[in-house]
Amino acid sequence: MFKHETVLLHETVDMLEVKPDGIYVDATLGGAGHSEYLLNKLNEQGHLFAFDQDQTAIDNAKMKLADYSDKVTFIKANFRYMKEALNERGIEAVDGILYDLGVSSPQLDERERGFSYHQDAALDMRMDQEQELTAKIVVNEWSYQDLIRIFFQYGEEKFSKQIAREIERRREVKPIETTGELVDIIKTAIPAPARRKGGHPGKRTFQAIRIAVNDELGAVEDSLEKALTLLKPGGRISVITFHSLEDRITKHLFQEATKGPELPPGLPVIPDEYKPDFKLATRKPIVPSEEELEQNNRARSAKLRVIEKIIK
C-alpha cells in the first residue's frame, strides 16, 4: 500500500498563491498529497503536470487523483528533465512549481527497494528501477577513495575512511549483496562509543549511497536552475528540503537568483535591467509546526524555501 505522510502540505501549496486557471508543476509527485491539494484549487482551465521517476508512485497517484484526471498530466521522468518534458508538450512557462525532496515513505518502507537499514534486502536504492546503477554496484565496484568521498560529502560521516576500509576488506572475500551485510560492516567499522550516539549507525552511509545512486544533488541543482527559467512573472517555486546538502544548494541558488547584476558606480536611479528578476517570498525558511511534528516525526528536519519571479 502506497501510504505517504505529506509534509508542510498547506504551507507548500498556499505559498504558491495558486491561480485557479494557472499551470503548475509538482516535480516530486510521490504520495500525491501536494498534488491533490493543489488540484483542488484549480478550475477547468487550470492544469497540473506531475513528475515522478517511480512508476509505482504514478500508478498509485492515478488512482488517488482519478477525479481530477482531466486536469493532471503524469510524466515518468527525473525532474532534472522537467523543462524538456514540458517544452515537448508545448509548455514554455508555468505559474508555479513545487518540490518535496524527501524520499517518499513507501520507498523507504518497501523492503525489496533496498533503501532501509532497518530491513534486510538486496542492495538496490534506485528511484528509477530501469536505471543500471544500483547500491550493490557502488558498494562492490567503486574505489576506496570514491567511497570515502561520497560518505563524507553526501553523508557527512565522520568515520568515512573506517567504513570504506571495512567494505574493501569484506568485498575482497565475497560480494556484499544485502543491506543487512552493509549494516553489519558499518557497525564493525564505527567505534563502539560512536555507535551508541545519534540514531542508527547506518543512517549517514545509507543516505550517501542513495544520493550517489540517484545523483540526487546533481538532479536538484539542474532542475532548480531550469525551474527558474520556466516561471512566469509573479510565479513561485516552493522547495521542501530534508537535509543540509539539499538545503544548501536551494539556498545558494535562490540567493544568487535574487541578486541583480553588478551596478556601475554613480547611478542616481537603478535601471530596470539592473534590478533582480527574483525575490525571496519569505526571509527565513518555513518549518513544520509542533502539531505537525507530533503527527509525523519524519517532518522534523523539513525546511520550506520559496522564491518569486518579480513582475516588471
From Swiss-Prot:
It holds the Pfam family Methyltransf_5. Its EC number is 2.1.1.199. This is Ribosomal RNA small subunit methyltransferase H. It comes from Listeria welshimeri serovar 6b (strain ATCC 35897 / DSM 20650 / CCUG 15529 / CIP 8149 / NCTC 11857 / SLCC 5334 / V8). Belongs to the methyltransferase superfamily. RsmH family. GO terms for cellular component: cytoplasm. The gene is rsmH. One of its GO terms (molecular function) is rRNA (cytosine-N4-)-methyltransferase activity. Disulfide bonds: none annotated. S-adenosyl-L-methionine binds at A32, G33, H34, D52, F79, D100, Q107. It is an enzyme of class 2 (transferase).
